From Swiss-Prot:
It is found in: Secreted. It comes from the Eukaryota. Keywords: Cell adhesion impairing toxin, Hemostasis impairing toxin, Platelet aggregation inhibiting toxin, Secreted, Signal, Toxin. CDD domains: CAP_euk (cd05380). Inhibits platelet aggregation induced by all agonists tested. May act by competing with fibrinogen for binding to glycoprotein IIb/IIIa (ITGA2B/ITGB3). The lineage of its organism: Eukaryota, Metazoa, Ecdysozoa, Arthropoda, Hexapoda. Its main location: secreted. Belongs to the CRISP family. Coiled coil: none annotated. One of its GO terms (cellular component) is extracellular region. This is Tabinhibitin 1. Residues 67-211 form the SCP domain. InterPro entries: CAP_dom, CAP_sf, P14a_insect. Residues 1-23 form the signal peptide.
Length: 255
């Protein structure tokens, strides 16, 4: 009986997620400290998109690849790898269609960092990572994803226990924003978008991923434990050091 109720709850939550995504008027959402909301108005390509801009569909295989890469890193960090402390309650990240839709709209600007809001009714302070590609030939989508992950993975040399306990974007060894966001224990979901275009003889691409939360300066990236997942209600079957996807973590509550 319990399993039936849980299944019904998850189905209802999924239906609500999609219904909310379609019904929200982003122009009316609070947008503090930003010029505009990325979800407000009709989506159109910006002048920066050069010639032949095209927003690419991220298929299930691409979405699974992104989730696998992120959860692999989270699982690795949660068990205390790279000299980092173990995570007490870091959950498996799932795909979110609304975050992906806003990420897709962001990529149509063909500029990585902007002053646009990306908050939703469910996620009040989403984080964002942008990966820009430029080359003679456009690689396959999976190769773009792999390149983006490798770039973020290099930040493991910059991040320390001190950064985990007291977050800031930069330190003596360089930027840690990307990796720190991927391993935040308040991140519960992610959604990405991809746009490609031509700029003269160059092929360019912008891959954007929106996360359900972002790290806050001076606050912990995740809560430290004496053993991996010691505070989890239930561990994930695949990622043994992470909480399951149903772990009730509030992405809007700071550590």
């Amino acid at each position: 009986m319990t399993s039936i109720l849980v299944s019904r709850f998850l189905i209802a939550a999924l239906v609500l997620q999609y219904a909310t995504s379609d019904a929200v008027n982003y122009c009316r959402l609070p947008c503090r400290g930003c010029d505009y909301h990325v979800g407000c108005g009709e989506p159109a390509y910006a002048q920066e998109c050069g010639q032949s801009p095209r927003t690419r569909e991220l298929l299930k295989e691409h979405r699974n690849e992104i989730l696998s890469k992120i959860n692999d890193v989270r699982d690795h960090v949660a068990k205390g790898s790279w000299g980092l402390p173990m995570a007490a309650r870091m959950k498996v990240v799932v795909w979110d269609a609304e975050l992906a839709g806003l990420a897709k709209r962001h990529t149509k600007g063909c500029v990585g960092e902007t002053h646009a809001c990306r908050n939703t009714e469910r996620f009040w302070l989403p984080g964002q990572l942008n990966f820009k590609y430029s080359g003679d030939k456009l690689p396959r989508i999976r190769e773009l994803i792999d390149d983006a992950v490798k770039k973020g993975h290099l930040q493991k040399h910059n991040i320390t226990r001190e950064f985990i306990e007291n977050y800031r974007e930069n330190g003596p060894n360089g930027n840690v924003k990307g990796l720190a966001l991927a391993i935040s224990d308040r991140v519960t979901a992610v959604g990405c978008g991809l746009t490609t275009w031509e700029d003269g003889a160059k092929a360019r691409a912008l891959l954007t991923c929106n996360f359900s939360s972002q790290n806050i300066r001076g606050r912990p990236v995740y809560k430290i434990g004496n053993s991996p997942g010691e505070k989890c209600i239930e561990k994930d079957e695949t990622y043994k050091n992470l909480c399951s996807a149903t772990e009730p973590i509030d992405p809007n509550k700071s550590n």
